Structures are given as C-alpha cells and as structure tokens.
Regions:
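Short alpha-helical DNA-recognition segment
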Residues: 23-48, 63
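Conserved core of the PLP fold type I
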Residues: 217-348, 365-379, 547, 559-560
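Conserved core segment of the aminotransferase class I/II
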Residues: 207, 378-457, 467-469, 551-552
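A short, Lys/Arg-rich alpha-helix, primarily the initiator
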Residues: 1-25
C-alpha cells in the first residue's frame, strides 16, 4: 500500500517552511532577521529555498539554523538534533578544517544510520584541506572508505548571484503544468502574455517586409541596430512630443525589452545600489536588479486609486544609494494607466534627486476606453530618461524578440554610464537582424491593435468577461484595466485565509487545470492577489472562470 502523503520524507525547503511557520515568521521577517545578523538575503531567495527552486546557500545556513532553533543538518537532511560531540570518537584525528566545519560537526554527531551524510560532508571538508591529503595516501587511514578520485564527484552548483533571482511566471507552476500536459491533461493557460498561441495574428505587411529583407539580414548589423529602424523609432517619439533633441545614436535595438533591461542594470548598478521598482511589478525588473548586485526597493501602487503609484511612498524610499526609478506604464500586472499628474510628480522626484527614469512602455498601444498614453520622455528634460518598448505585444510578434530602448533628457552627466551601455551592446554583437526589419513598417501605417481594443473588439470583450466574472465570485474584487491584457484581482483573506498563494494557485492548477501566477510572483507583499491573462478566446475564458468559481466555492466550504 502506498503511504499517505504526510508520511513521505520532506525535502529541505519543506523543512525550512515548517520551521519558519513554527516560529511565526513571514519570509520577509526572516529575511530581515538574517540580514540583521550579517547573512544578507532577500525574501525571494527564501521563497526559492522553500519551493526547492534553489538549494540553501551554505554560508547562510548557520544563521538560518540559529534563527529557526534547529541544527543545520536537520535543514539539509532531516537529521534530528543529537548529543555532544564527545559521544562520538572518530578513528582519525580531525584537521582544523574538518573540526571547524559546522555542517560536518552536525553530521559527526549523528548515529550510524546517518553515516552516508557524514561521508558526504567529510569529503567536502577534506577536499578543501591540504592537511588531509596524507590521510588518503594510505587506504587503511580512510575510515569512511572514500574513493581516491572523489574530486570528480564535486557537485556543480549554480552561482550564488542567482540566489536572489526569481521569475515565477515561468517557475514551478508552469513546470507542473508542463508535466500535467505530458500526462494528457488539457490546461487552460492564463499565465503568460504571449498573443500568438491564442490566435492573434501578426500584421501581414510586417511578415512580408521581414521576408523580403531576409537576404539583407544574414550578417551582423551595427551593435545598436540598423539605421532605418532606429530612425523610425526616433520619429515615433518626436511625433508624440519628445522634449529634448535625440539622435539615432541614442536608440538601441535589443532581443526584446527583456535583454535591454538586464543590460541596463548591469551597466548602472554597483553592489548595494538601489532601484525603486513598483509593487506589484513585472518580476524581470527585480530579478535583473538583483542579478546585477543591486537591491530592488519596491514602492507601493495603490489599489484603491486604480493602482496609481503612491508618490509619498516613492519619496520616502529614496536614499543615497538610489540610482533610478522604474515606471511600468501601462502596468503589468494590474493593467493600470498612470495619470499625467502622477507621471509629472515622479519626474519631479527624479530631477530633484538626480535619478535615472526607466520607463517600461511596452503596452503603450494596447489601450481601452479611448484613454491616451503619455510617454515619460515627453515630460522630462532635466533627468536621464530611458524608454523601453517593442513589437511583442502591440504587433503580436513576441517570438521575433524585437525591442528597443531610447535615451532622452539630460545626458551630459551620464557619459560613463552610456559608454557602459555601448560596451555591453557590442559584447552581444547585435540584436536579431531579421526582426529589425519589422520595426520601420510597424512604427507607421495602420495600427491593427486599435481594432482589437475598441468596443466589441476581441480584447475589449475578453477584458469585460474576465473582470465581470471575477467580481461575481464571492470574496474576489478586481479593478478594470485600462491597458495591456492583464487584471490583478484581490482575494479577501477573511473568507480565504491564505498563507501561501503559490500553493493556492498550485491547488487550483491540480484541481481545475487552470494555470495562473500568484501575486507574490510579481513582488506583491501579501498572499492575496493573482494575475489573470485575458488573451484566450471568450469560450475558453468563460470555461476558465467557471472552473475558478467552482474552486473558490470548494475553498469556502473548506475554510468554513
């Protein structure tokens, strides 16, 4: 008979989760305590450990175990706390390296059943200790029966730089959904903003122009991109009221906006530098800042004010280490469109504190209800503005990876930073050249996205279905997005007392075969939101909402 789930052994992340909850700590509180104790770590890193996405970093382990009142070996392998080391006499003297290894000490304190754990930890310590080389010269001096070629078995771990990097949009939930699909389950996917799989076709004139120019696209281009595409981008913003004179040299083409975000953070941040990023955010911004050695500091967007940025919160979080402010407008994941008044106030803060403004405007042409998007570059002239945009969403060609960034505003003080951007652009040689030929055509002429977002257009109708159906479910509330193709409903935790929103979404996936991403995956501070992508057609979207309604009804019964 198969054992019940609660008898199965826990992995390290589950033991960590149990101990944290037993201490009554949130991931954010535990991260703060560890940082205060000298073992700097982020909430995202602890979440990664608990989910099993990353292993617990060895140099953080002693502090973690101390704060959770358990041994290191318990967290790593489940070994219970054991008596003093004097109860175990090793058959050979321990070198200083071995004797001082905290993890090894725990292993040596374990009973015979844990000899395998001790063997592994002794091996690790001995490999770092020159004093122990003689121990292995004679097989009779090898009490643990270790192979002489143990160096070939050294575990290859990911870089510690990735410990604070988290991107849940393609994380454990998607991985589970992929396994379920392989088993024959049909999953309704409301997790990724990729128009193509849902029947949104790219404009034919773009495909034709790219095909026609393929003979010209078989070699490298200029590192910043072909001239005609960059010129078309420049003229696009000039027509919108670009304040400062900008040259083609200020435009960089990239393999999607994602590449350019990472490139910017690498060029901008030294270790410990801070970037203000909206909460909730598109998680690549936080991941890129952390990967560059910086610190993502999240400012609040106010749900009661249709997710507009909280200007006072932004200002309160500016420090001497702050290098820039990120503005995602229209916003992913909330679908909010920021007012001109809010944008002007953010510009004023950037100018006052000499900060870089990074404006992610990839959804600037995906707008509803006749609203108008105001580019940040048309409002700022006394600070450096970097505008990010592309064709993935507005022209439904995400697979082309056709994106750009443009520098505007005050640039004299940023010459060294710009030199860094140029160097990094050259290191990746150039962006995908065939896709660069889509840009000039896309920037002018008929904008087919407008037909999709107008009343009775497909995206408009699907937005109405998603928001109205979500608001009809007891305990859910959702603001109406004015841009993009996402909404970010709130869960009333008085009705659904959720502690782990990823686990909640995992239960939804397994029970109802609907895939979405939890709110904390967008660096929201509480487990009470999730993101809905309303790209699927009306029939599939209604089916997903039926399943969601059924799932929440069952949860209400479960929670009583």
């Amino acid at each position: 008979m198969q054992p019940a789930d609660d008898t199965l052994p826990l992995h390290a992340g589950q033991r960590l989760l149990q101990r944290r909850k037993a201490k009554g700590l949130t991931t954010e509180q535990l991260a703060a305590l560890m940082t205060e104790a000298g073992a700097k770590v982020s909430r995202a890193a602890i979440s990664n450990w608990e989910r099993g996405s990353n292993g617990i970093v060895s140099n953080k382990l002693p502090v973690l175990a101390r704060l959770l009142d358990c041994s290191e070996s318990y967290l790593l392998s489940g070994t219970p706390n054991i008596p003093d080391a004097t109860t175990l006499q090793p058959s050979v003297p321990l070198s200083p390296t071995v004797a001082q290894s905290p993890s090894l000490g725990d292993a040596l304190l374990s009973d015979v059943s844990n000899a395998a754990n001790a063997r592994i930890l002794v091996t690790s310590a001995l490999l770092q200790d020159k004093d122990c080389q003689t121990v292995f010269s004679d097989s009779t001096s090898n009490p643990f029966n270790l192979s002489r070629d143990v160096t070939t078995m050294k575990t290859l771990n990911k870089s510690n730089k990735l410990q604070n990097v988290c991107y849940d949009i393609r994380g454990p939930l998607l991985q589970t959904a992929t396994r379920m699909e392989a088993q024959g389950h049909k999953i309704i996917k409301l997790n990724v903003g990729n128009p193509a799989p849902f029947g949104f076709e790219a404009p034919q004139e773009i495909l034709s122009d790219v095909a026609m120019n393929l003979p010209n696209a078989i070699g490298y281009s200029d590192s910043q991109g072909i001239f005609a595409a960059r010129k078309a981008i420049l003229q696009y913003y000039q027509a919108k009221g670009l304040l400062e004179a900008v040259d083609v040299a200020d435009v960089y083409l990239g393999n999607g906006v994602s590449e350019l975000i990472v490139l910017t953070m690498q060029a901008l941040l030294d270790d410990g530098d801070e970037v203000l990023i909206p909460m909730p955010d598109y998680p690549l911004w936080t991941a890129a800042a952390n990967l560059a050695g910086g610190k993502a500091v999240h400012y609040l967007c106010d749900e009661a004010d249709n997710w507009q940025p909280d200007i006072a919160d932004i200002e309160s979080k500016i420090t001497e280490r702050t290098k820039g402010i990120v503005v995602i407008n229209p916003n992913n994941p909330t679908g909010a469109l920021y007012t001109t008044e809010h944008l002007r106030k953010i510009v004023a803060l950037a100018e006052k504190h000499n900060l870089v403004l990074m404006a992610d405007e990839i959804y600037d042409r995906v707008l509803y209800d006749n609203v108008v998007h105001v580019p940040m570059c048309t409002l700022a002239k006394n600070c450096l503005v970097i505008t990010y945009n592309g064709l993935s969403k507005s022209h439904r060609i995400a697979g082309f990876r056709s994106g750009w960034m443009m520098l505007s505003g005050k640039k004299d003080h940023a010459s060294d930073f710009i030199e860094g951007l140029n160097m990094l652009s050259s290191m990746r040689l150039c962006a995908n050249v065939p896709a660069q030929y889509a840009i000039q055509t896309a920037m002018g002429g008929y904008q087919s996205m407008q037909a999709l977002t107008a009343p009775n257009g497909r995206l408009y109708v699907q937005r109405e279905i998603a928001v109205n159906r979500l608001n009809s479910i007891k305990g859910l509330s959702c603001t109406m997005p004015q841009g993009a193709f996402y909404c970010f409903p709130k869960i009333d935790r008085n009705i659904y007392p959720i502690e782990d929103d990823m686990q909640f979404m995992m239960e939804l996936l397994q029970a109802e075969k609907v895939l979405m991403v939890q709110g904390t995956g967008f660096n929201w501070h509480a487990p009470d939101h999730f993101r809905v992508v309303f790209l699927p057609n009306a029939s599939d979207l209604n089916e997903a909402m039926d399943r969601l309604e059924r799932f929440f009804a069952k949860k209400r019964q479960e929670y009583g």
